[in-house]
Amino acid sequence: MTAALSSEISLHPLLDNLPSSASTTTKQEEPSLPALPITLICHCPPSSSPGPIKVTLTNQILHNHACGCSKCWKPSGALFSVVGVVPSSGLSVIANAEKLEVVDENATIQRWKCKECGVHLYGRIEKQHPFRGLDFVHGELALGQSGGSEGEGENEGGGLGEGKVEFAAFVSSIIEGGFEPHAHANGDEGKGGNIKQVRDRLREIFGEKVYDCLSPSLMDVIAEWEGRRSGKLKAVL
């Protein structure tokens, strides 16, 4: 039997204290949907000059999931990000856009971060892709959530949209990011300890919805898009 995941290891602040999905309190509580528009804010202090970047969303955030990939922005010390999507047409930068810069111009998802605090405000796909037209965002950056600026009471409770984190994706990618996958005999587990402990804890939260890619429904969307583009599937008129 694998030992429990060390309390010193953070999956993500929104996940660390969630109960087991098999417990009587079962799944994550379903918070009410945040009022629209949702305002996301970087981690620069309100008193800084020229102040934090602000982004507004006119749609609820969908498909929230824990992502272990090495590209997503994660809170300090966390193994996973929590990320979801909104229509690109409903996202606007309303304050201090000049502080934004692209993390990696060659990446499929153009992630725009704050030059000063490093927080990713949104990720956009410009090239042909099944998810083009959707922007990737971190709902925890909503005002009133842990990442937002204190004293601004909008969107109290954050902007997770659908109200919960649905699944875990790209779990094995945390190893690429520096998580030691093996428990060491001498007890010195460094940054990690045991990837099985991580998977076991994620299954306590998400049940069987723990993947090394995206969820099956989203992978089906990608596969169908590729099939229609290649002509192996009939075009939808």
Swiss-Prot record:
Residues binding Zn(2+) 2: 67, 69, 72
Chain sites annotated for binding Zn(2+) 1: 42, 44, 114, 117
Gene Ontology MF annotations: metal ion binding; S-(hydroxymethyl)glutathione synthase activity
Presence of the UniProt keyword Metal-binding in the record: yes
SUPFAM superfamilies linked to this entry: Mss4-like
Gene Ontology biological process terms, A to Z: formaldehyde catabolic process
Entry keyword annotation includes Zinc: yes
Cysteine disulfide links: none
UniProt similarity note: Belongs to the Gfa family.
Free-text function comment from the UniProt entry: Catalyzes the condensation of formaldehyde and glutathione to S-hydroxymethylglutathione.
Entry protein name: Putative glutathione-dependent formaldehyde-activating enzyme
